[in-house]
């Protein structure tokens, strides 16, 4: 029996093949997929709308500021109400560390209870479009591409992937992308290296998940503070900037307090910290360190 993580890339490949041959992939003859974006989005917003359309669902965005939520309606009430009209609900909530994933679980629990109590005729699918912990739609898309590139999920075993911090002239980028990658790729027996300058740590619990996944899958997980070391003999490299875990904690407190001056001071501090690591950059010389220079 295939696990969900094994089945999804295969299902995605089947949909891609059907779409390429202009064969209908519509599972639904009608229906609605609702999106709730509590942070800005471009790529995920359009890819979610495209996916809904591919399956036969129309897309409707919920603007919480224009809904009854703005008048005090609870999460439970809103979740159940819109679920009468929906087959899927996608949520992005990544701004506040410790809140986004918890909110999604609260919505999920409300839907479970609504269906159990007979309030809802069906329980809509809940899609995490990025939270403070994970970005599963992106990491699963990355996994699907790796499966296509290397031929199968089985062929990913033993492949070395370097998830590395990279310099960016901005700050406050979420932890969810690198966390999603180390949490997912360690499930498939890959040798996963997480590289970042000292102090740019991820959420400790997620790192523990990656370690445990690697042990269970026969892969490996290690952390280094050298981009060169991570790139050496890597089959896949994934350079990505992110803010340190401690900074994201402080940023969350400032955002909640609506402390604009504090946010400006934190940004200035973090940009100066980032500037100390401009050598963390994916160059041609760095790529030559990868396996046969062809990662």
Name each region found by the language model.
Residues 6, 82, 229-230:
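Structural alpha-helical scaffold elements that stabilize or flank donor/cofactor-binding regions
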Residues 73-77, 175-180, 254, 278-282:
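Charged helix-capping and loop-helix junction motifs
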Residues 240-295:
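Glycine-rich phosphate/nucleotide-binding loop
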